[in-house]
Amino acid sequence: MADLSLYRNIGIFAHVDAGKTTTTERILKLTGKIHRLGEVHDGASTMDFMEQEAERGITIQSAATTCFWKGHRFNVIDTPGHVDFTVEVYRSLKVLDGGIGVFCGSGGVEPQSETNWRYANESEVSRLIFVNKLDRMGADFFRVVEQVKKVLGANPLVMTLPIGREDEFVGVVDVLTRQAYVWDDSGLPENFEVKEVPADMVDQVEEYREMMIETAVEQDDELMMAYMEGEEPTVEQIKACIRKGTRDLAFFPTFCGSAFKNKGMQLVLDAVVDYLPSPTEVEPQPLTDPATGEPTGEVATVSVDAPLKALAFKIMDDRFGALTFVRIYSGKIKKGDTILNSATGKTERIGRMVEMHANDRNEVESAQASDIIAIVGMKNVQTGHTLCDPKHECTLEPMIFPTPVISIAVKPKDKNGSEKMGIAIGKMVAEDPSFQVETDEDSGETILKGMGELHLDIKVDILKRTYGVELEVGAPQVAYRETITKAVEDSYTHKKQSGGSGQFGKIDYRIRPGEQNSGFTFKSTVVGGNVPKEFWPAVEKGFKSMMDTGTLAGFPVLDVEVELFDGGFHAVDSSAIAFEIAAKGAFRQSIPKAAPQLLEPIMKVDVFTPEDHVGDVIGDLNRRRGMIKDQEMGLTGVRVKADVPLSEMFGYIGSLRTMTSGRGQFSMEFSHYAPCPNNVAEQVIAEVKERNAKK
């Protein structure tokens, strides 16, 4: 069995243009995995293997790859940097032990970098920082280091310093060993010499070395005391301190280079080995109670000898068939084994298992704790399901995905395309839990729901190219909600007595606004037997079933509290179904009396703009009914944070590019629901009525 201390499960994440995929390519080249390098700007990168990715030059799906460096096994996951795909970042962070945050030497810390960094902090993932593209015009390593401190609130520990700036960037100095690595102009990673530190950098290197040692020895009291008394620790002692501090998120070892020009990458790979944790050094995954979702107090110990515990973290359908990507936390698995899916209660036999290299695969006979593999042809597995030993059932902490906020109606151009579309969408929903589908009962239209415009654009594109389904696409629709603002006390009787056994159910109830995010809550305070206890669940079920369709415009209803306090029943004619029907009628009768209100999704918007355009950007956000929350002066421009209704954000990227001459960037994520202004609510309700009239 492989030694788990030699494993590194790492992710590479960053903003869209920071050079993340190129960095991954270089890692694969240096570790001997690929021979010709694929450049993203040629659309030929190894990791970006979907047509949509190659064309748009952005990474959409985290592709997993196994490679080796200095006797260590790296499982590398390349994650997307675009905000509409943060679900992929979140999903991959769940199965990583460490990461490399890539920042552009000229762009610095971009809005998306901050979102990904926050996710990584929440997941407590240890990271290295790689400041890339130092050969670019305007690149400044030290400015980016300052941004990491200010914008991310992180503590970068500078490990290498750049030799030369912009097009004169030739290499890096390793601050710890005081050695200079200088590359020639061939672009080949192996063509470098190790030299003495350039004379004009000696003082700077010593200054950064002293800062590094002072920060590192804080991890070891004895070493710190010795250092304060003038005794310098050895390189190995310093490395041990850096390793501990990195693991505890006290700081982030920071490197520089140019992935595209192949300069500085070897030191980053060495740092993955030296400083990022092995699977046995991170907090083990908690086990949860499947009924409540609460932690049981037990964990999935990272050990080959423990019973199997694995998490299916990604489903993909490619030209080879269905692939289930699995991170094994405990135990081992081999071809022919029968495993239990604790979410469905069903067992499956393991057929083929493969190690993935972007779009290629190597078959394996067995895998063990800490491996990331893909299993071919699993039937009933979805993202977030736990796979375990049938004799030792368990459930790993599940993945929670954000709720979609935007939808489009689609139908196949070809009448015979419906079945084909249904099968294709079914596969896509299994692959991406933040992408949902439903059928409009009245119109029969298929409604696709997602995290943003780009997210849905790409889904439509995949349907067209991968599955050959041409679609007619409707305008994007916002996921509005309804709620009530006033308490109502009311009574409703359902009576149907026309010979034979009839139906009778009378309920007296109060409906009032619930706490925010409470959904639907029900309680019964009936005293005596006016509504027998066995009918209470039917009353609750009746009310709850009506929450999907509000009375204003048919949108789902949020945050309503119902109290059943009295009623009446008939010894012969009363039944659970009679009380359920009574509750449904009561909902329709009383919600309009409770001052219903339309709610709209509010997005947390983060805009980066050059300083000379900030007035235009803020004016535009105000026109979009935005609330400006914060403004921060950066070194390269201004960051504006605002809460803006989603309905006002369609096509925003085009407007922002026009306003800022193509230099502005933004990210947005769902924040909360808030009441619509009356004029907006009236317009939305009128549009819904008009649409319904046409059906």
Swiss-Prot record:
PROSITE patterns associated with the record: G_TR_1, G_TR_2
Keyword Repressor on entry: no
Species lineage: Bacteria, Pseudomonadati, Pseudomonadota, Gammaproteobacteria, Vibrionales
Keywords annotated in UniProt: Cytoplasm, Elongation factor, GTP-binding, Nucleotide-binding, Protein biosynthesis
Any one Gene Ontology cellular component term annotated for this protein: cytoplasm
Pfam families, alphabetized: EFG_C, EFG_III, EFG_IV, GTP_EFTU, GTP_EFTU_D2
BP-aspect Gene Ontology terms: ribosome disassembly
Task of the protein: Catalyzes the GTP-dependent ribosomal translocation step during translation elongation. During this step, the ribosome changes from the pre-translocational (PRE) to the post-translocational (POST) state as the newly formed A-site-bound peptidyl-tRNA and P-site-bound deacylated tRNA move to the P and E sites, respectively. Catalyzes the coordinated movement of the two tRNA molecules, the mRNA and conformational changes in the ribosome.
GO molecular function annotation: GTP binding; GTPase activity; guanosine tetraphosphate binding; translation elongation factor activity
Family: Belongs to the TRAFAC class translation factor GTPase superfamily. Classic translation factor GTPase family. EF-G/EF-2 subfamily.
Protein name: Elongation factor G 2
Entries under SMART domains matching the protein: EFG_C, EFG_IV
Localization, UniProt: Cytoplasm
Annotated residues for binding of GTP: 14-21, 78-82, 132-135
Source species, domain of life: Bacteria
InterPro entries: EFG_II, EFG_III, EFG_III/V, EFG_IV, EFG_V, EFG_V-like, EFTu-like_2, G_TR_CS
tr-type G domain location: 5-280
Family annotation (HAMAP family): EF_G_EF_2_B (MF_00054_B)
